[in-house]
Regions:
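N-terminal anchoring/stem segment of glycosyltransferases
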Residues: 1-73, 287, 291-306
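Short acidic donor-binding/metal-coordinating loop in glycosyltransferase active sites
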Residues: 62, 113-117
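Nucleotide-sugar donor-binding/catalytic module of glycosyltransferases
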Residues: 19, 91, 98, 105, ...
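Catalytic core and acceptor-binding pocket of nucleotide-sugar-dependent glycosyltransferases
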Residues: 163-253
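Short aromatic/hydrophobic "clamp" motif used to bind/position activated sugar donors
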Residues: 110
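Active-site-proximal specificity loops/subdomain of glycosyltransferases
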Residues: 49-103
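Long, low-complexity C-terminal extensions of enzymes
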Residues: 236-307
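Conserved donor-nucleotide/metal-binding helix-loop-beta segment in metal-dependent transferases, i.e.
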Residues: 117-151
């Protein structure tokens, strides 16, 4: 039995070219029952002007997801803690992934997916027992766990990270977590946001002091371990270094021979070493693609024709 779920994409303007390329692959390889794009008002206007969306995609202003969860309010809280205002957008994205569960129309399950990431193989998010499949990663950042402990009283109990380019949320569990975050009080957007920002250590408020995926993963793995299954799944973050920010179908097919998804992050190269690395990876990408397309030409044509 297929478990229904919706997919939400939080995006900014610089990710729109990748999102335009990636959306057909999201439909093909993830096949959600509903897609919602969440962005600033100006970004939504640009999306409408580009006109690459189908009519069934829902557009939602980031300041209207849940009352009280706004960029201005997050910026105010970050600055009041002595943090840099420029980090507010980074925190807002994560807070919105949590807040989406508070919307009454939200489905029982919702998948968050990074807008700069393209799936290149079919990906399932539930096993045959209905357990949510969570990606297992190797990242470790101690301040995340200091915040988790201050926020909900849980320590790190696993030797891996839940931080990937997506997360499958069960609305029921997320609402329970939010109630824990507001400490039994009335579940309001402003209260939950304030409690999260307040829990971050002052030394890390201007950096990376909170991770929604690490927080949710830690909570669910502790409270409902039989509801999830952690898996190793192959992915790559430096798709842009290999193939640029406008990957072709042949680029994506090449990636699909090794990975389930690829991210195309628009990092700025600042040092000579970074420039050399990017040049080398771009050359390797061209060689890799040439070999794959030549040796697997029929499979490539099939991959291309289905999109």
């Amino acid at each position: 039995m297929k478990i229904k779920f919706e997919l939400i994409l939080l995006t900014v303007e610089r990710h729109l070219p990748i999102l335009e390329i990636g959306l057909p692959y999201i439909r093909r390889f993830i096949n959600p029952d509903k897609i919602t794009i969440i962005a600033s008002k100006s970004c939504l206007e640009k999306i409408n002007n580009i006109g690459f969306l189908d009519e069934d995609v829902v557009l939602l202003d980031e300041d209207n997801v849940v009352e009280g969860v706004t960029l201005d309010y997050v910026r105010f809280l970050v600055e009041s803690r002595g943090g840099q205002a420029g980090r507010a957008g980074w925190y807002l994205k994560q807070l919105l992934n949590f807040a989406y569960a508070m919307r009454p129309e939200t489905m029982d399950y919702y998948l968050t997916w990074d807008a700069d990431t393209i799936p290149v193989q079919p990906i399932s998010f539930f096993d045959d027992k209905g357990r949510m499949l969570l990606a297992k990663k190797s990242e470790y950042h101690e301040p995340y766990f200091s915040t988790i402990e201050a926020l909900i009283g849980l320590k790190r109990e696993v030797d891996f990270s839940f931080i990937a380019e997506h997360m499958m949320f069960k609305r029921e569990y997320m609402l329970d977590l939010l109630r824990l975050i507001v400490r039994g009080g009335h579940l309001e957007g402003k209260v939950f946001v304030k409690n999260v920002i307040t829990a971050i250590q002052s030394d890390h408020i201007s950096g990376a002091g909170f991770a929604e995926y690490e927080t949710y993963g830690t909570y669910v793995y502790k409270k409902s371990p039989k509801a999830v299954l952690v898996r190793d799944i192959s992915s790559v973050r430096w798709g842009a270094d290999l193939f640029g920010l406008k990957p072709s179908s042949s680029d994506l097919y090449t990636l699909s021979t090794r990975y389930s998804w690829a991210s195309f992050e628009s990092w700025k190269v600042r040092t000579v070493a970074q420039i050399r690395r990017r040049i080398l990876l771009r050359i390797l990408g061209k060689i890799w693609k040439f070999v794959i397309v030549i040796t697997k030409y029929k499979a490539y044509i099939l991959f291309k024709s289905k999109n």
